[in-house]
C-alpha cells in the first residue's frame, strides 16, 4: 500500500510543476460554397459608314459555377502560462499554432500569437509574434468563422490586422483607459513589394497571357503601432494607429482593397511611403445585445509625391435568443483616391448574415451567408456570393 501511495505522489509531482500552464484552442470546420460574378464594360469604336466612327459599348458578363468543399475555419491550439517572480512581478508566455482538421495548413510552430514577457503593476511587456492593435479591435467588429476571409469575413476592412514579430507594451488601466505601443524592426517587417501583373507573349502561332505573382525583396522599414482603449460598463471604445515611413507592406494592403483589379499594371508603382492607418471602433453590450461600429482611414504616398487614400466603415449587430445568436455585419468602402485622383465607381459593399446555435458552452453550430460587390470602374464589378455551415468546439 505504501509503495502504491509513493508512486501516486511521485506521478503527481510533474503535474504540480506545470499547474500554471493552460491548454486552449478551437476546432472549427464545415462545408462552404462560393461563386463569382463579374461584369466588364468596354468602349469600342464601330464603323458608322458615312457618319464615320461611332462609339459603342461592349458589356461582358461572366459567372463561375458554385464551388463547394469541406474547409477548416481557422482551428488553432495554444499553450500559455505564467510564473510568479515575487514583488508583484511575473513572467508570462504563450505559444499558439494554426492547425487544420481538413489537412495541410501551416508547418511552423508559433505561427499565431506567441510571445514571452513580464507583467506587473507597470503593465505588460511582451516580445515575439504579438497581435497588433487592429487585430485587438477586430474581435468585436468581425466575429465570423470561415475559410473565406475576403467574403465570409470582413477581410478587406481587416487587412491591417497582423501578428508581427515585435515588442509591445500595454499599460495598466486608469479610470477605464488603457494604452499600448508596439514596434516592429525593419528586419522583422514584411518585405519590399513588387506588384503582381499580367504579361502577354506572342509566339507567332499563338498569344498567351500569364499572371506574374508579386515578388518580395529586401526588408521594408520600421513599423510603429499605438492604441488607446476605454471601457465603462457595457461601452467599449478603441483607437488603433499604424505608421511606416517606407511602407512596402502598404502596397499589399492597398492591392487587397482593390481586390486584385490590376490597377498598377504598367504604371511602375514604387513602394509606398509615409503609410499610416487610423481606425476607431466603438461597441456596446447589454444583456444579449451586442453592437459594434468602426471607421478606418488608410493614407499613403507614392514615390512621385502623389497621394493614396481609402475610407471605410463597418458595423455588426447580434442578439441572443436562448441558445441562438443571430448576427449581421455590413461594410462599405468609399471610392478610393489613387495618385491624387478619385477612382470613379471604385467602392465596395459587403453583407454577412448568420446565426450561431450553442449546443453547450463550448460547442456551437455556425451558419452564415455572405455577399460582396467590389466596383472596379464605371460599369465594372466583381461579386462574390458565399455560404457556409459548420461546427465549432472551444477547449
From Swiss-Prot:
It is found in: Cell outer membrane. It is a multi-pass membrane protein. One of its GO terms (cellular component) is pore complex. Residues 1-19 form the signal peptide. Its main location: membrane. It comes from the Bacteria. Disulfide bonds: none annotated. GO terms for molecular function: porin activity. GO terms for biological process: monoatomic ion transmembrane transport. InterPro entries: Gram-neg_bact_OMP, Gram_neg_porin_domain, Porin_dom_sf, Porin_Gram-ve, Porin_Gram-ve_CS, Porin_Neis. Keywords: Cell outer membrane, Ion transport, Membrane, Porin, Signal, Transmembrane, Transmembrane beta strand, Transport. Homotrimer. Serves as a slightly cation selective porin. Major antigen on the gonococcal cell surface and it may have pathogenic properties in addition to its porin activity. Belongs to the Gram-negative porin family. This is Major outer membrane protein P.IA. It comes from Neisseria meningitidis serogroup A / serotype 4A (strain DSM 15465 / Z2491). The gene is porA.
Amino acid at each position: 500500500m505504501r509503495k502504491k501511495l509513493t508512486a501516486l505522489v511521485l506521478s503527481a509531482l510533474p503535474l504540480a510543476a506545470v499547474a500554471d500552464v493552460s491548454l486552449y484552442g478551437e476546432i472549427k470546420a464545415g462545408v462552404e460554397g462560393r461563386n463569382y460574378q463579374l461584369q466588364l464594360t468596354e468602349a469600342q469604336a464601330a464603323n458608322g459608314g458615312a457618319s464615320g466612327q461611332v462609339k459603342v459599348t461592349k458589356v461582358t458578363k461572366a459567372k463561375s459555377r458554385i464551388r463547394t468543399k469541406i474547409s477548416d475555419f481557422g482551428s488553432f491550439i495554444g499553450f500559455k502560462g505564467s510564473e510568479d517572480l515575487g514583488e508583484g512581478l511575473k513572467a508570462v508566455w504563450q505559444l499558439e499554432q494554426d492547425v487544420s482538421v481538413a489537412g495541410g495548413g501551416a508547418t511552423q510552430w508559433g505561427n499565431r500569437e506567441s510571445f514571452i514577457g513580464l507583467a506587473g503593476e507597470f503593465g505588460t511587456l511582451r516580445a515575439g509574434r504579438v497581435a497588433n492593435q487592429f487585430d485587438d479591435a477586430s474581435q468585436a467588429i468581425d466575429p465570423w468563422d470561415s475559410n473565406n476571409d475576403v467574403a465570409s469575413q470582413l477581410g478587406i476592412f481587416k487587412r491591417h490586422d497582423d501578428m508581427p514579430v515585435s515588442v509591445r507594451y500595454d499599460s495598466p488601466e486608469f479610470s477605464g483607459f488603457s494604452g499600448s505601443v508596439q514596434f516592429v524592426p525593419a528586419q522583422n517587417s514584411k518585405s519590399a513589394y513588387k506588384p503582381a501583373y499580367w504579361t502577354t507573349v506572342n509566339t507567332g502561332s499563338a498569344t498567351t497571357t500569364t499572371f506574374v505573382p508579386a515578388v518580395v525583396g529586401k526588408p521594408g522599414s520600421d513599423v510603429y503601432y499605438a492604441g488607446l482603449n476605454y471601457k465603462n460598463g457595457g461601452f467599449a471604445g478603441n483607437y488603433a494607429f499604424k505608421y511606416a515611413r517606407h511602407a512596402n507592406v502598404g502596397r499589399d494592403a492597398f492591392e487587397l482593397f482593390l481586390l486584385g483589379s490590376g490597377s498598377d499594371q504598367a504604371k511602375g508603382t514604387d513602394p509606398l511611403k509615409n503609410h499610416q492607418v487610423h481606425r476607431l471602433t466603438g461597441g456596446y453590450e447589454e444583456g444579449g445585445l451586442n453592437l459594434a461600429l468602426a471607421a478606418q482611414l488608410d493614407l499613403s504616398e507614392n514615390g512621385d509625391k502623389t497621394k493614396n487614400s481609402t475610407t471605410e466603415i463597418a458595423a455588426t449587430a447580434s442578439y441572443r435568443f436562448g441558445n441562438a445568436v443571430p448576427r449581421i455585419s455590413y461594410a462599405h468602402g468609399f471610392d478610393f483616391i489613387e495618385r491624387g485622383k478619385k477612382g470613379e465607381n471604385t467602392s465596395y459593399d459587403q453583407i454577412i448574415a448568420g446565426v450561431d446555435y450553442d449546443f453547450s458552452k463550448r460547442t456551437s453550430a455556425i451558419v452564415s451567408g455572405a455577399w460582396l460587390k467590389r466596383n472596379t470602374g464605371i460599369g465594372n464589378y466583381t461579386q462574390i456570393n458565399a455560404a457556409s455551415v459548420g461546427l465549432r468546439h472551444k477547449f
